[in-house]
Amino acid sequence: MVVIVKRGWQFYALRDAVIVAVTLLSWWGSQSIETLGIIAGVGLGMSAYLFHEWAHLLAAIRQKASVGFATRWYAIFLFSMRSGMISKRAFFDISFAGFFATLLYLLFFLSLPPSNVQAVALLLAQCLAVLTLIFEAPIAIWAMVTDRVPAADIPFFDRFC
């Protein structure tokens, strides 16, 4: 039996802060224990994704968009936005917040001296950037070309998140 629990942004803020804290501690410890470098690299890649998602969410909250939060602690998407209720301008603000966050994250890691931790994190962040281009950019371009806000609701969100 699966128990569905209503959670707000505070739960995910705490969850993600723990992920980032473990990541930073692993990064710090990777100087003396190589295995921690792998954990740190994967954690930094996950942090890139979380940074991207939180940028979307904070922009959605700022735009007063209607959002539904995930119900499972392991949800990969923090929320699903009801895009039919927002303006085109709000849609662009929310979309570009995630794009900009990913760009900042990539620039940050490109500015660091090369290391194994940085290499793993950068690879994962680049994968995120490619996925963003494949899945999110076409939606934003479609909104630019047409005069409508495209559906951005995540299909089956309630079932998987």
Listing of model-derived features with the role each one plays in the protein:
Residues 1-161:
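Hydrophobic transmembrane alpha-helices and their immediate loop junctions
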